[in-house]
Amino acid sequence: MKHIVKHIHFVGIGGAGMSGIAEVLVNLGYQVSGSDLARNAVTDRLAALGARIAIGHDAANIEGANAVVVSTAVRSDNPEVLAARAQRVPIVQRAVMLAELMRLKQGIAIAGTHGKTTTTSLVASVLAAGGLDPTFVIGGRLISAGANARLGTGDFIVAEADESDASFLNLYPVIEVITNIDADHMDTYGHDFARLKQAFIEFTQRLPFYGSAVVCVDDPNVRQIIPFISKPVVRYGLSPDAQVRAEDIDARDGRMHFTVIREGRAPLAVVLNLPGLHNVQNALAAIAIATDLGVSDDAIQQALAEFNGVGRRFQRYGDVPTADGGRYTLIDDYGHHPVEMAATIAAARGAFPGRRLVLAFQPHRYTRTRDCFDDFVNVLSTVDALVLTEVYAAGEAAIATANGDALSRALRAAGKVEPVFVETVDALPEALAKVAQDGDVVITMGAGSIGGVPAKIVQNTQQKG
């Protein structure tokens, strides 16, 4: 590619999916430019690496580019897209560019409705501990690396495979992981769950004859598609028929202790530096791949015990003073689907038994809130105290029956929790200061602008101190 394409421009370069690919391309020696609506830590990092960053979208930003990379979130009337089309500069989907990177190495693609980012991070960390020095592209910041992407010298590239827009069908990896299949982003599949499952089957058909599908048999929908997978399958999970499974699971001190049972191998005692059964499952996927690639048991154990997590995935911000002189524990999480939220809440209950759980939640997308409305009411009713904000639209038109006020009314009618509703995330720090008590565990959760709230709370605390 490099002899023809030297300058690559990214529209929306600050996004999690785009920035990782851009960083790898910078490190491969390409000239990279990009634009976004606002400056952030990601754009600053890319600029420091040598990328040319523009704030705001303008036709002039693509000057000299041989290719323009876009995601499905970029509108067709974006001025940079229009300029590229007028100048006959190829417009490349993000997943297609990721597929080009995978052609340079052997790809390990992590798919599934939930758990992709954490599983990708665990796989990359375990392979790195085993000396394989993988390249990785992750949808969140791997805390140990300080970035969501890295160019390694090894043979493998580990990346998330996105089913939300069916773009994972552009990838041709040698190993695939399917963590679970759940009803999300159903607009892509015509609100037909059978079509979504068929897309995952087609994803496995991208594997070469020597490839393998590493699948979680605890998920009933994944289990249903196994008979239709024509390539070798490795089953992992907590189920008795899993080839890589966890037994004797014990949650202690925010960590998961368990024994891994693998066919033809001695039992392996593991301490995972993450809470929650869902993270045990995610770790099993990494263990299955690492075992197949010859990573030593010692390296597997070390990587999982020392795993520092991923930004916005049960990320701990430490203890914060309360108004009455006590302290509460602050955690931030990206969960935005009821299934993810339930798993995180369960993990918090296990990590902090007996403590009051306060949730600050910003729903993400009106369509998701509408489609999962009853499930949101059920999962939000399981916390001890709730602060709710208006829905983060993500470009969607508002739906009056699926906005924050409608969700608040439904929660009050359910009668299990009395939500405190605030219109904006800017009001969250003050609202939480009134709600939080000594000894509480406070979780800020959502995929939108709520991600900036924990740092704001910490900053406010430091200024007062």
UniProtKB/Swiss-Prot annotation:
Q: What is its main location?
A: cytoplasm
InterPro entries of this UniProt entry? Answer: Mur-like_cat_sf, Mur_ligase_C, Mur_ligase_C_dom_sf, Mur_ligase_cen, Mur_ligase_N, MurCDEF_pg_biosynth, UDP-N-AcMur_Ala_ligase_MurC
Question: Do you know which Gene3D superfamilies this protein is assigned to?
Answer: Mur ligase, C-terminal domain, Mur-like, catalytic domain, NAD(P)-binding Rossmann-like Domain
Enzyme Commission number(s): 6.3.2.8
Tell where it localizes. Answer: Cytoplasm
- Identify the pathway: Cell wall biogenesis; peptidoglycan biosynthesis
User: Which keywords label this protein?
Assistant: ATP-binding, Cell cycle, Cell division, Cell shape, Cell wall biogenesis/degradation, Cytoplasm, Ligase, Nucleotide-binding, Peptidoglycan synthesis
Q: Name one GO biological process term.
A: peptidoglycan biosynthetic process
Give any GO molecular function from the UniProt entry.
UDP-N-acetylmuramate-L-alanine ligase activity
Q: Under which main EC class is this enzyme filed? A: ligase
**Which SUPFAM superfamilies does this one have?**
MurCD N-terminal domain, MurD-like peptide ligases, catalytic domain, MurD-like peptide ligases, peptide-binding domain
Its GO CC terms are: cytoplasm
User: Does the entry feature the keyword Cell wall biogenesis/degradation, yes or no?
Assistant: yes
Instruction: Enumerate the catalysed reactions.
Output: UDP-N-acetyl-alpha-D-muramate + L-alanine + ATP = UDP-N-acetyl-alpha-D-muramoyl-L-alanine + ADP + phosphate + H(+)
Residues that coordinate or bind ATP:
112-118
Domain of life the protein comes from: Bacteria
Work out whether the entry's keyword set contains Cell wall biogenesis/degradation: yes
Q: Function of this protein?
A: Cell wall formation.
What does the sequence similarity comment in the record state about its family?
Answer: Belongs to the MurCDEF family.
Write down the NCBIfam families for this protein, in alphabetical order: murC (TIGR01082)
Q: What is this protein called?
A: UDP-N-acetylmuramate--L-alanine ligase
